[in-house]
Regions:
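Short beta-alpha connecting loops at secondary-structure transitions
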Residues: 110-111, 124, 172-176, 206
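Feature representing long, continuous alpha-helical segments
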Residues: 124, 174, 178, 182-189, ...
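Phosphate/pyrophosphate-binding loops at sites that engage ATP/ADP/AMP, CoA/4′-phosphopantetheine
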Residues: 188, 192-206
Length: 227
């Protein structure tokens, strides 16, 4: 048995490889001779109440839930080829409230995680620094945001229009880009830290693959490469 917090529920069980009588790295033991069979597993679990709430929301549509899949695993099935999974690939899904990641190596999952930081935190940063409401901060990020501060913009600033109390307000785009850049640096470093601790960072052979709403932000790939 594997111990996980009582508040959590199992989502996925991935067999990385088998051991036959102590022989390591066996991918398929069928047909082999031996007296002892062991396996190296990677388990993914989540907070039970959050999973239950997600199911309840879908059923209220009304629709039925066939299964629950960890977001970057679902993305990996579309984005990654078998060769890329074998060579090593890191999928990072930056959502609103969380950043989820999964690392493939030798065709199977070797590490995964969920961080409590995402695009909504960037909106909050913009709102606090520029002193604008959250809905306007989101619009600024989507319409004028850029992750790479070194790449020059065609404009140095913009003037807000059609915004109650903020009509005519000038926004410094360099400052906006700096806010986004700093939070993204934090997010990618938070992903990097556990990979370094487990000694898995050098297993990213075929590259880093970004998904989620934040992946559309211009220059985000360069920030990921910088980290």
């Amino acid at each position: 048995e594997v111990a996980i917090p009582e508040t959590n529920a199992f989502l996925h069980t991935h067999i990385r490889h088998y051991f036959v009588d102590g022989q390591e790295g066996v991918e398929n033991p069928v047909g082999m001779c031996g007296t002892q069979l062991e396996a190296d597993f990677h388990l993914i679990h989540g907070i039970r109440t959050r999973l239950q709430n997600a199911i309840r929301f879908v059923r209220e549509l009304p629709m039925e839930v066939a299964d629950i899949v960890f977001s970057p695993l679902a993305s990996a099935q579309i984005m990654l080829s078998r060769q890329e999974k074998d060579e090593g690939a890191l999928v990072i899904d930056i959502g609103g409230g969380t950043t989820d990641y999964v690392l493939y190596n030798r065709g199977s999952v070797c590490q995964s995680g969920c961080l409590a930081v995402g695009g909504d935190h960037i909106n909050n940063d913009i709102s606090m620094v520029l002193k604008v409401p959250h809905n306007l901060a989101e619009k600024l990020k989507v319409n004028y945001g850029r992750a790479n501060v070194e790449e020059a913009s065609s404009k140095n600033s913009i003037v807000l229009t059609d915004e109650t109390r903020f009509n005519g307000r000038e926004i410094d785009l360099e400052e906006l880009h700096e806010i986004i850049y700093l939070r993204l640096m934090e997010i990618f470093n938070c992903v990097k830290k556990p990979l370094l601790e487990r000694g898995h960072l050098d297993r990213v052979g075929s590259g880093i693959y970004l998904t989620g709403g934040m992946s559309l932000l211009p220059g985000i790939d360069r920030v990921a490469a910088e980290v």
